[in-house]
């Protein structure tokens, strides 16, 4: 299936050769696309870390993902190739075999129609241009309606599975150090952020703004984390903070690091904006702050939540999963996520 991300001629050729060699049945070309998108170091195969980054759904545990990986790895190489992916999933497609085949046809039909539109639209009459715009809009509406139905079904099945497991499973948290980054074609382009500020500001009620007070607090926390990572750290007694029993003593701070592919920067910014808008409207979300590192396509996202339960529930929401899925294409490497509990009194103090 097509993907907006560029691929090199050699990559396209190898995909075509592989598809021909495997004699893929109708609809199975999706697994060529899955391998290409999940293969972050472009070596033509999936390591367990790459497999986990792509397939983790917040329901299967790390152990279950590891077991699934080795079940698919019939060649016993500790890596997965397209043949192994196709061989495993083809045994479990059921009715989705027809769905994938239809998607393959639909993908080709839409690309053909858009190619025709690009070629003829400028010279068409006003009425013909109107019809083209109308058909594009209605096609999009139909696809969005189907997407909403699929997302509803996906949420229902995941919730049912969690209930059967007697409680929500803690999603697999990715914290992977990658030896190298996917080679991307770095191009100097206009940055839609303010050239005088490394901060990413999302305007609108309840959203982020550049806040020196909060950035100071965040920088303090970052320094604390850096200190805690040093082996020679010596802890000394500090002044005790006495907390009443009926007081919520801690809040959850989540730090997310994302390295964005330069060519996908604008699309990532739009997806991030939608994510922040949705997350900030949740009752358990106290605040979200975003930093963009200067001269890099790297973002630091800090999320403050009332507690870990609210955070885990947030991970299962539709908008959060949509953002996670889009990041598969937008990020050079899987995002790094870390969490820590901080005294709730900090929040109360800074908001009084």
UniProtKB/Swiss-Prot annotation:
<feature type="binding site">
    <location>
        <position position="41"/>
    </location>
    <ligand>
        <name>Ca(2+)</name>
    </ligand>
</feature>
<dbReference type="InterPro" id="IPR011992">
    <property type="entry name" value="EF-hand-dom_pair"/>
</dbReference>
<dbReference type="InterPro" id="IPR002048">
    <property type="entry name" value="EF_hand_dom"/>
</dbReference>
<keyword id="KW-0963">Cytoplasm</keyword>
<keyword id="KW-0479">Metal-binding</keyword>
<feature type="binding site">
    <location>
        <position position="39"/>
    </location>
    <ligand>
        <name>Ca(2+)</name>
    </ligand>
</feature>
<keyword id="KW-0677">Repeat</keyword>
<dbReference type="InterPro" id="IPR018247">
    <property type="entry name" value="EF_Hand_1_Ca_BS"/>
</dbReference>
<keyword id="KW-0175">Coiled coil</keyword>
<dbReference type="Pfam" id="PF03992">
    <property type="entry name" value="ABM"/>
</dbReference>
<feature type="domain" description="EF-hand 2">
    <location>
        <begin position="60"/>
        <end position="95"/>
    </location>
</feature>
<dbReference type="GO" id="GO:0042984">
    <property type="term" value="P:regulation of amyloid precursor protein biosynthetic process"/>
</dbReference>
<dbReference type="InterPro" id="IPR007138">
    <property type="entry name" value="ABM_dom"/>
</dbReference>
<protein>
    <recommendedName>
        <fullName>N-terminal EF-hand calcium-binding protein 1</fullName>
    </recommendedName>
</protein>
<dbReference type="GO" id="GO:0005829">
    <property type="term" value="C:cytosol"/>
</dbReference>
<feature type="modified residue" description="Phosphoserine">
    <location>
        <position position="4"/>
    </location>
</feature>
<dbReference type="GO" id="GO:0042802">
    <property type="term" value="F:identical protein binding"/>
</dbReference>
<feature type="modified residue" description="Phosphoserine">
    <location>
        <position position="192"/>
    </location>
</feature>
<feature type="coiled-coil region">
    <location>
        <begin position="135"/>
        <end position="163"/>
    </location>
</feature>
<feature type="coiled-coil region">
    <location>
        <begin position="209"/>
        <end position="275"/>
    </location>
</feature>
<feature type="compositionally biased region" description="Polar residues">
    <location>
        <begin position="190"/>
        <end position="202"/>
    </location>
</feature>
<feature type="modified residue" description="Phosphoserine">
    <location>
        <position position="197"/>
    </location>
</feature>
<feature type="domain" description="EF-hand 1">
    <location>
        <begin position="26"/>
        <end position="61"/>
    </location>
</feature>
<dbReference type="GO" id="GO:0001835">
    <property type="term" value="P:blastocyst hatching"/>
</dbReference>
<dbReference type="InterPro" id="IPR039862">
    <property type="entry name" value="NECAB1/2/3"/>
</dbReference>
<comment type="subunit">
    <text>Interacts with STX1. May interact with CPNE6.</text>
</comment>
<feature type="binding site">
    <location>
        <position position="45"/>
    </location>
    <ligand>
        <name>Ca(2+)</name>
    </ligand>
</feature>
<dbReference type="GO" id="GO:0005929">
    <property type="term" value="C:cilium"/>
</dbReference>
<dbReference type="GO" id="GO:0005509">
    <property type="term" value="F:calcium ion binding"/>
</dbReference>
<feature type="domain" description="ABM">
    <location>
        <begin position="252"/>
        <end position="340"/>
    </location>
</feature>
<keyword id="KW-0597">Phosphoprotein</keyword>
<feature type="region of interest" description="Disordered">
    <location>
        <begin position="180"/>
        <end position="202"/>
    </location>
</feature>
<dbReference type="InterPro" id="IPR011008">
    <property type="entry name" value="Dimeric_a/b-barrel"/>
</dbReference>
<dbReference type="GO" id="GO:0005654">
    <property type="term" value="C:nucleoplasm"/>
</dbReference>
<feature type="binding site">
    <location>
        <position position="43"/>
    </location>
    <ligand>
        <name>Ca(2+)</name>
    </ligand>
</feature>
<feature type="binding site">
    <location>
        <position position="50"/>
    </location>
    <ligand>
        <name>Ca(2+)</name>
    </ligand>
</feature>
<keyword id="KW-0106">Calcium</keyword>
